[in-house]
Swiss-Prot record:
It comes from Vibrio parahaemolyticus serotype O3:K6 (strain RIMD 2210633). Its EC number is 2.7.7.38. The gene is kdsB. The keyword Nucleotidyltransferase applies. One of its GO terms (cellular component) is cytosol. Disulfide bonds: none annotated. HAMAP family: KdsB (MF_00057). This is 3-deoxy-manno-octulosonate cytidylyltransferase. Activates KDO (a required 8-carbon sugar) for incorporation into bacterial lipopolysaccharide in Gram-negative bacteria. It catalyses: 3-deoxy-alpha-D-manno-oct-2-ulosonate + CTP = CMP-3-deoxy-beta-D-manno-octulosonate + diphosphate. Keywords: Cytoplasm, Lipopolysaccharide biosynthesis, Nucleotidyltransferase, Transferase. It is found in: Cytoplasm. Belongs to the KdsB family. Pathway: Nucleotide-sugar biosynthesis; CMP-3-deoxy-D-manno-octulosonate biosynthesis; CMP-3-deoxy-D-manno-octulosonate from 3-deoxy-D-manno-octulosonate and CTP: step 1/1; Bacterial outer membrane biogenesis; lipopolysaccharide biosynthesis.
Amino acid sequence: MSFTVVIPARYSSSRLPGKPLADIGGKPMVQWVYEQAMQAGADDVIIATDDERVSAAVEQFGGKVCMTSPNHESGTERLAEVVEKMAIPADHIIVNVQGDEPLVPPVIIRQVADNLAASDAPMATLAVEIESEDEVFNPNAVKVVADERGYAMYFSRATIPWDRDNFAKQDKAIVNPLMRHIGIYAYRAGFINTYVNWAPSALEQIECLEQLRVLWYGEKIHVAVAKEAPAAGVDTPEDLEAVRAIVAKKA
C-alpha cells in the first residue's frame, strides 16, 4: 500500500515565529517531522511551505518542497494545492502530518494510511483515550464519538458523551472512557478537492473544527485508537523547550 505524506510548514506563527526552523538537537524542527514520516514507510514526503527560508532549509537536508500560496485559509486548502501541483492521482492516499509535531510516532502515520486503505471512507484519523479528568472538560481537547464500525459520529470541544450519572457526582471521575481526537489525517487525494469546494458548514464554524464539514455533507471519517499516543506538539516557546529536553535525554 503506497501513500504520500504532506507536511504543512508555515513560517509565520503568532506564538512562535519561524517555528519550522526552530533548532532541536542540531536540526530544524521540520527535519524531525520529515524523518519521522520517512520511517513510516511513505513513498514520498513533501514539505508544503509558503516561505523561501523553510524551502532552503528543507533542500539543505535533502527533502522535497512544494511552494504554496500564503493566502490559504486552512491546511486542507494547502493540501489541495499540493495535490494539484504534484499531479497526485485521485485514488492515492495522502497523510497530513502537522509540521509542529517533531516527535510524531512513525507507527501512527502508517496506521492512519492503512486504516483508510481498508475502509470505504474518503478520510481517516486517530484518537487516544482520555486519562486526565482536566482534559475531559477542556475545550482545547477535542472529543470524538464513533459508531460500532469505527466511523465518526461527531467531534466536539464539549464533553461527549456526557456521562450523566457519574458527572453528576462532585468528583466527576472518569468511569466510561472518552476519546480525544489527535490531528493526523489520511485522505484519498481526489476527496481533498471535493472538500475544499464545499461551503463551510454551520457546525464547523460554531465548534471551529474543520472536520465537521465532512460529516455535515454526509461523508464518513474512519476513527481508530492510535497504536501509540503522540507527544505534544510545539505551539509555544515552553513547548519547544520541553521537546528539546526530551531529545537531549535520548541523545
